[in-house]
Regions:
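ABC ATPase C-loop
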Residues: 146-147
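The feature captures the beta-strand-to-loop junction immediately N-terminal to the Walker
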Residues: 33-35
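Conserved ABC ATPase signature
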Residues: 129-133, 137
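Catalytic Walker B motif of ABC-type/P-loop ATPase nucleotide-binding domains
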Residues: 154-158
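Conserved catalytic motifs of ABC-family nucleotide-binding domains
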Residues: 150
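Helix-to-loop junction immediately C-terminal to a conserved catalytic motif
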Residues: 48
């Protein structure tokens, strides 16, 4: 279970999050909803270890992860799909997916069939450059890259942005 207790976050003198607490259980989908500018992305960044919290606790399966850097979080099975289609435009689709393998042992470095089942376009276009894909296809690539590690926790910020409604399931 992911547990957040009394999380405060500041950017300079501005308080972005105040006493946020939540629990997300294994196998559950938890959505953070709110209007623009209320701190959803800041919360994701704090959970992903890319923005330091001012105070509060973040734990996964009872272990404090709030003190870990992003590469250490990846080793613990946490994957992130940031807002804004973070892909490598000059790498092929296949190469982009393979960048998600960073923390996996060599024997486990194969794109799971489930990724291609979710996003068939990635298999069809695996030799095309990421920058040549449409916005929705780039978003599918970003999600696919996060899924190649079969994460224990998947954090996604605006995950369906630009994806055609018939692909969203």
């Amino acid at each position: 279970m992911l547990e957040v207790k009394d999380l405060d976050l500041h950017y300079g003198n501005s308080q972005i999050l105040y006493k946020i607490s939540l629990k997300a259980r294994v196998g559950e989908v938890t959505a953070i909803l709110g209007t623009n500018g209320v701190g959803k992305t800041s919360l994701i960044k704090a959970l992903a270890g890319t923005h330091n919290r001012s105070s509060g606790e973040i734990s996964l399966a009872g272990n404090n992860i709030g003190i870990l850097q992003p590469h250490s979080l990846a080793k613990k099975g946490i994957a992130v799909v940031p807002q804004g289609r973070e892909i490598f435009p000059l790498l092929t689709v296949k190469e982009n997916l393979e960048t998600g393998f960073g923390c996996l042992p060599l024997k486990d470095r194969a794109v799971p069939d489930e990724v291609y089942e979710l996003f068939p376009v990635l298999k069809e276009m695996q030799n095309r450059r990421g920058g040549d894909l449409s916005g929705g296809q780039q978003q599918q690539l970003a999600i696919g890259r996060a899924l190649v590690t079969k994460p224990n926790l998947l954090l996604m910020d605006e995950p369906t942005e630009g994806i055609q409604p018939n692909i969203i399931k």
